[in-house]
């Protein structure tokens, strides 16, 4: 079973977390962050909701491939992966540490793409 939970909503975008089989990896990640790290990501979510993707430089919110994006959490070198759906929805799926060096995360990108396709099949994004 797949569903989405709203994290922040604004005039530009709605930022959500993906829940798969009653597990919300985004919420687990946010809960594990320090209060300072959580505050930074809350600010990013709020800014996305209010201003949309145009409100960021590439290093904070970056499109990786197609609908797959990442949100950079500066304090821990962790990336929160997400996908976009339509003009107004960003769905966060999970987090992962950035590998050393300038490496692409193809496995993470593939995972987000599979979750996006699952959401489309189950009609969650309509």
What annotation goes with each model-predicted range?
Residues 1-77, 86-90, 97-126:
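Basic, Lys/Arg-enriched alpha-helical interface segments
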């Amino acid at each position: 079973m797949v569903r989405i939970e709203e994290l922040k909503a604004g005039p530009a975008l709605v930022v959500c977390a993906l829940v798969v089989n009653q597990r919300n990896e985004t919420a687990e990640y946010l809960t594990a962050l320090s209060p300072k790290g959580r505050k930074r990501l809350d600010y990013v979510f709020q800014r996305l909701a209010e201003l949309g993707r145009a409100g960021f430089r590439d290093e904070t919110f970056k499109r990786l491939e197609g609908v797959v994006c990442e949100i950079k959490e500066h304090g821990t070198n962790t990336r929160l992966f997400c996908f976009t759906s339509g003009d107004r929805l960003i769905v966060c799926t999970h987090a992962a540490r950035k590998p050393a060096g300038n490496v692409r995360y193809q496995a993470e990108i593939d995972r987000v793409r599979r979750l996006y396709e699952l959401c489309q099949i189950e009609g969650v994004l309509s």
